[in-house]
Amino acid sequence: MQTHDAKRVEITIERAMQSRLTQALQEAGVTGYTILPVYGGSGRSGEWERSGDVTRGAGMVQVVCMIKPERLDHLLDAAFAVVEKHIGVVTVVDCQVLRAERF
């Protein structure tokens, strides 16, 4: 089976910034993404868990998308415009997809 090169971009950001981020991604031409809850973690500020959050807007989410390599810079520019002033981590991973026309 033939596979095609792609980039998997994972953006972990404060839940309150989720709609701003997804809007920026859509404006950058990203047509698909998945939003996952983040239940806890550890970073420069220490450990944290989502279980103690009182409001729905608190905590973190991870937005994951796969795109063609030539679209990466445009996506990263859009994501960084949202993430740079907030808590967030952006990772980029090389991956292979089976149906390139979907990305």
Label each residue range with its predicted role:
Residues 1-103:
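Positively charged, small/polar-rich N-terminal and surface patches that mediate targeting and assembly
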